[in-house]
From Swiss-Prot:
Pfam families documented for this protein: Aldedh
Oxidoreductase found in the keyword field: yes
Metabolic or biological pathway: Amino-acid biosynthesis; L-proline biosynthesis; L-glutamate 5-semialdehyde from L-glutamate: step 2/2
Classification via HAMAP family: ProA
Family (UniProt): Belongs to the gamma-glutamyl phosphate reductase family.
Protein name as it appears in the record: Gamma-glutamyl phosphate reductase
């Protein structure tokens, strides 16, 4: 695909932005939910073709897991669409309206960001979730999905076009870059017609987009997520949280990658953790202080403490207390998701206040860092950068504020 043809796709989308913002966006979301329920088998058929080719080419297991659509995904996606449709319209409301001494009323109005470029790896569910969030906020989307999911994405975008037509909205609101050529990623990075670029995938993709982009970038980076088991933790609860965080779905960004255990409870907790993880097929990699308490763990290398496994592998470290846990997270964490298990409110609140992450949890699984679970309906990604948005990005995070002033003929003196 040439840079010129990509420019033309983006230009057509930009020309329809005002129609998208003013149109019946909720109707399009509800229509898409209905179409998914009626035509899910078509989507699964395209997804099976993608999976067969990916398996032939040796795609890693973690990526195959993200590529695969399952029957249960239908319920998650349709519930998310309908939940977003029920959310208040984020556009048009004026915030902070205040009257100046001269009678001029000033405030800030919520408006769409505009045309968003979304570059993402082999995760077709994001073609539904990301578009639904962007559309609710009145934005148009230019999509470049991973080549492994091309058939799945094409089938889903075709349904989006039907939903948009049913709602009286232009199909340019959702445009799929019609090529698997990696050069299209670089062309999107150079496309100055975009108002924002959102990359969602591995470190290599994120770094490439950040280096090459000529427009603002909101990065969805890796999740090096920790659970700190405090000396006053309920150890049965801590075990459940560790199992849920690591084994429910290990190949996602909010999965648990490391457990930090207070030295006073390590002897009681670590053998239980090893037994439970072994039953789930999880390999433990441990620090020197933890190794004597574990029968089958292997030593953790120094260069892997900041690694995102996306697999059934878990790091374990014994720490002297909260201070060391905080220091470890500050050094190795990725500002994604961090959790503490404790019955001590003082320790919990210090953890909540001092840990720098997009979601910090007390006595809950890291798996809750998700737009649907946090009441956003869905998300376009989880931002680990602080400018504009931090954490799951729902419709509100895909708007911006412009100043408006309501006058009665005031002139500046």
């Amino acid at each position: 695909m040439t840079a010129t043809s990509l420019w033309e796709l983006a230009e057509r989308a930009r020309k329809r932005l005002s129609e998208i913002a003013k149109g019946n966006r909720d109707r399009a979301l509800l229509a898409m939910a209905d179409l998914l329920e009626a035509r899910w088998e078509e989507v699964l058929r395209a997804n099976r073709e993608d999976l067969e080719e990916a398996e032939r080419t040796g795609l890693p297991k973690a990526k195959l897991d993200r590529l695969a659509l399952k029957e249960k995904d239908l319920k998650t996606l349709t519930e998310g669409l309908r939940q977003i449709a029920r959310l208040p319209d984020p556009l048009g409301r004026i915030e902070g309206l205040a009257k100046r001494p001269n009678g001029l009323r000033v405030g800030r109005m919520r408006v769409p960001l505009g045309l968003i470029g979304f570059i993402y790896e082999a995760r077709p569910g994001a073609t539904v979730e990301a578009v639904s969030v962007a559309l609710k906020a009145g934005n148009a989307m230019l999509l470049r999905g991973g080549k492994e999911a091309f058939r799945s994405n094409r089938a889903l975008v075709a349904l989006w076009h039907e939903a948009l037509e049913e709602a009286g909205l232009p199909e340019e609101a959702v445009t799929l870059v019609p090529t698997t050529d990696r050069e299209a990623v670089l062309e999107m990075c150079r496309l100055e017609l975009l108002d924002l670029l959102i990359p969602r995938g591995g470190e290599e993709l994120i770094r490439l987009v950040q280096q090459e982009a000529r427009v603002p970038v909101l990065a969805h980076a890796k999740g090096v997520n920790h659970l700190y088991v405090d000396e006053k933790a309920d150890l049965s609860m801590a075990l459940r949280l560790a199992l849920n965080g690591k084994t429910q779905r290990p190949a996602v960004c909010n999965a648990l990658e490391a457990v930090l255990v207070h030295e006073k409870v390590a002897e009681a907790f670590l053998p239980r953790l090893e037994k439970a993880m072994r039953e789930k097929g999880v390999e433990l990699r441990a620090c020197p202080r933890a190794l004597p308490l574990l029968k089958e763990a292997v030593p953790a290398r120094e260069d892997e403490w900041d690694r995102e496994y996306l697999d059934l592998v878990l790091r374990v470290k014994v720490v002297s207390g909260l201070e060391e846990a905080l220091a470890h997270i500050a050094r190795y964490g990725s500002r994604h998701t961090e959790a503490i298990c404790t019955e001590d409110p003082k320790a919990a609140w210090r953890f909540l206040e001092e840990v720098d992450a997009s979601l910090v949890l007390w006595n809950a699984s890291t798996r809750f860092n998700d737009g649907f679970e946090l009441g956003l309906g869905a998300e376009i990604g989880i931002s680990t950068s602080k400018l504009h948005a931090y954490g799951p990005m729902g419709p509100l995070e895909l708007t911006t504020l412009k100043w408006v002033a309501l006058g009665e003929g005031q002139e500046r003196t």
